[in-house]
């Protein structure tokens, strides 16, 4: 079964219905609900949410899962949410209550399925936290409870605020243990960067030509023969290095099967955006553990990057005999199949609601050219008008 989600009257979202694929891109201006959709999706696929719906009727406790993502206040009296999972579960929120059903299982079979799934996840989570499986969850300190619960989830959120991590890379443990009042998503991000640093004392980012070196005193960045403190490196480096380390760590530990990335373009020059997106595509193609990726962005440039990968994959499928020609232009690890990507454009309607539409051309499987050209067309039009005015001035002199 394909994943799809219906959202009505939740935060800035009035009424949308979307079918989700392996890679899902949401593009639009600020405040139209891109992050709301990504965060809601992360919550709705949470095994722990499914468990609570089945075994706990306390709706306030269930909604605490949404508080982690800062969207708990988005629920309204007429909010309606419906989420269909790949494994045939249907999670609904209607008239102030969550419900869960299955296309084949009755309630008893659902409980058995979720308990078994949760049990495997719990054991893996205990091991990841360095705890004995015999430990009683209720007796664990709050910090260890938080680690266990976060490791049990299937989705990991990479927030836009991630660039703040670089400024405090050598104070992460203190920030986490001191319970500094930061958003839970950011604290979790900090926690996983701390784990990643312990795992990778040195970490290379080939497409940036640098190496990260973890240290108890001051983390370092090595670029060629030049070494600088990580906290004094560029904002782009501070944003991208922890993110890549965390993703690699999570994949190696088999923690999450789904990732949501906010604004990959943050603090990055276009060529670095290109390298980052292609790095992410290669991870998706190489790692069997990644089942789903959501990206929110403001950048049409990122769509152009993706379109090149889709086109390469399309030509490869149509004419395998042209493999050598295609791979000379773009390596196979950067190719995408149009069947595994969906791109949605979000915008504000006249009445203030959010409009969400697919911008994949159904006939070609590629991102619609008129959408990609829209921004450059506006810029070109303005430039041409100014250029004509400039030429007129020159002629009058």
Predicted regions and their residues:
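Pre-Walker A-like glycine/lysine-rich segment at the N-terminus of P-loop NTPase domains
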Residues: 1-43, 47
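N-terminal pre-P-loop "Q-motif" helix
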Residues: 8-12, 239-242, 272
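Phosphate-coordinating catalytic segments in nucleotide- and nucleic-acid-processing enzymes
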Residues: 19, 45-260, 332-397
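Pre-Walker A (Motif I) flank of P-loop NTPase domains
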Residues: 21-23, 256, 291
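Short hydrophobic/aromatic beta-strand immediately N-terminal to the Walker A/P-loop
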Residues: 24-27, 260, 294
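Active-site/pore-lining binding-face segments in mid-to-C-terminal subdomains
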Residues: 43-45, 50, 267-356
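Walker B catalytic acidic pair
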Residues: 262-264
């Amino acid at each position: 079964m394909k994943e799809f989600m219906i959202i009505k009257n939740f935060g800035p979202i009035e009424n949308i219905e979307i079918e989700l694929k392996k890679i899902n891109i949401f593009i639009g201006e600020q405040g139209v609900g891109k992050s709301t959709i990504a965060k809601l999706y992360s919550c709705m696929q949470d095994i722990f949410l499914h468990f609570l719906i089945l075994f706990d009727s306390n709706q306030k406790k269930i909604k605490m899962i949404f508080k982690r993502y800062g969207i708990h206040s988005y629920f309204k009296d007429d909010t309606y949410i419906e989420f269909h999972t790949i494994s045939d579960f249907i999670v609904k929120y209607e008239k102030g209550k969550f419900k869960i059903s299955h296309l084949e299982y009755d309630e008893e079979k659902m409980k058995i399925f979720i308990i078994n799934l949760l049990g495997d996840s719990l054991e893996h989570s205990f091991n990841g936290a360095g705890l004995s499986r015999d430990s009683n969850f209720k007796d664990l300190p709050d910090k260890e409870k938080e680690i266990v619960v976060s490791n049990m989830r299937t989705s990991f959120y990479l927030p836009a605020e991630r660039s703040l991590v670089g400024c405090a890379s050598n104070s992460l443990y203190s920030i986490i243990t001191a319970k500094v009042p930061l958003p839970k998503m950011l604290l979790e991000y900090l926690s996983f960067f701390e784990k990643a640093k312990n795992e990778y004392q040195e970490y290379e980012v080939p497409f940036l030509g640098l190496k990260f070196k973890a240290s108890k005193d001051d983390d370092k960045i090595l670029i060629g023969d030049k070494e600088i403190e990580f906290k004094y490196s560029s904002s782009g480096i501070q944003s991208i290095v922890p993110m890549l380390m965390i993703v690699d760590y999570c994949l190696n530990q088999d923690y999450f099967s789904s990732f949501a990335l906010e604004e990959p373009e943050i603090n990055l020059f276009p060529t670095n955006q290109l390298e980052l997106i292609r790095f992410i595509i290669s991870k998706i193609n190489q790692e069997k553990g990644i089942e789903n990726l959501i990206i929110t962005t403001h950048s049409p440039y990122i769509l152009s990057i993706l379109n090149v990968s889709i086109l390469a994959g399309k030509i490869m499928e149509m004419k395998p005999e042209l493999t050598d020609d295609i791979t000379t232009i773009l390596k196979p690890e950067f190719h995408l199949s149009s069947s595994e990507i969906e791109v949605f454009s979000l915008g504000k309607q006249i009445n203030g609601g959010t409009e969400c539409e697919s911008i994949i051309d159904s006939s070609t499987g590629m991102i619609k050219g008129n959408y990609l050209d829209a921004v450059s067309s506006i810029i070109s039009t303005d430039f041409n008008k100014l250029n004509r005015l400039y030429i007129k001035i020159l002629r009058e002199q």
